């Protein structure tokens, strides 16, 4: 990038036992109604390295980093470059905050924890039902320590390992074994469900309800669905489930 080209803007703020790193990517208009400025992963890593060298000494070694990118669109190589730049300064990228589904998928696929929030939208008629964001689909196993937070439905094609967690405002579908924590309808949606290919967790959550799973349920090796009834959370084989059974 030449000297007169806009550069990525970084801001690092220590917050307790981690640091928050915000990234803003400027845009330029290359054609009518077509704002764009793409930074390669090498450019992002170099820019971050320069910034961190200026900020050196403001954190302890191995401090965890929460990267806030908001509406910026980043792919896996760019996220890996940011992680590499942080590692050179003894910082560890752990979380990514974004309201772009593509960035959330790239981060989750890289094994990072994800907090996907909805982008700010113009005010609408309060009588209109707010729509959930598109489902977040993660095509790999969620390893221990990984976190997924999403304002809509979450689909995991893989296992959810012990020590990992999924929190969704909508439904959760796990095409694998659930050994970690799953919380559907996190903002009080009692109509949310959790569908699991195989359950090996001790507890699950829907809305504000908590269910402890007995050993007999854990041993069942068939797809199951968890949902709320008038008696609390119920776990039923998918082949026996009827939508009318929901609270």
UniProtKB/Swiss-Prot annotation:
It comes from the Bacteria. GO terms for biological process: cell morphogenesis; cytokinesis, division site positioning; division septum assembly; regulation of cell septum assembly. Keywords: Cell cycle, Cell division, Septation. SUPFAM superfamilies: Cell-division inhibitor MinC, C-terminal domain. Cell division inhibitor that blocks the formation of polar Z ring septums. Rapidly oscillates between the poles of the cell to destabilize FtsZ filaments that have formed before they mature into polar Z rings. Prevents FtsZ polymerization. Interacts with MinD and FtsZ. PANTHER family: SEPTUM SITE-DETERMINING PROTEIN MINC (PTHR34108:SF1). Belongs to the MinC family. This is Probable septum site-determining protein MinC. The gene is minC.
């Amino acid at each position: 990038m030449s000297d007169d080209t806009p550069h990525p803007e970084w801001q690092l703020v220590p917050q307790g036992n981690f640091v928050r790193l915000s990234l803003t990517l400027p845009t330029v208009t290359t054609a009518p109604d077509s704002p764009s400025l793409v930074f390669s992963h090498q450019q992002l890593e170099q820019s971050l390295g320069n910034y961190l060298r200026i900020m050196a000494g403001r954190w302890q070694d191995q401090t965890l980093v929460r990267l806030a990118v908001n509406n910026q669109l980043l792919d896996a190589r760019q996220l890996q470059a940011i992680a590499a730049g942080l590692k050179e300064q003894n910082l560890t990228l752990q979380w990514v905050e974004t309201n772009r589904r593509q960035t959330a998928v790239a981060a989750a696929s890289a094994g990072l924890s994800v907090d996907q929030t909805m982008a700010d939208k113009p005010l609408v008629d309060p009588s209109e039902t707010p729509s959930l964001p598109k489902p977040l689909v993660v095509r790999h196993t969620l390893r221990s320590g990984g976190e997924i937070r999403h304002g809509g439905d979450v689909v995991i094609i893989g296992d959810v390992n012990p020590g990992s967690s999924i929190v969704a405002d909508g439904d959760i579908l796990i095409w694998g074994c659930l050994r970690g924590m799953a919380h559907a309808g996190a903002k009080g949606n009692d109509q949310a469900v959790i569908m699991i290919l195989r359950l090996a967790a001790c507890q699950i959550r829907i809305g504000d309800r908590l269910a402890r799973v007995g050993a007999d349920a854990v041993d069942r090796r068939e797809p199951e669905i968890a949902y709320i009834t008038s008696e609390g959370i119920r776990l039923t084989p998918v082949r026996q489930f009827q939508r009318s059974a929901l609270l």
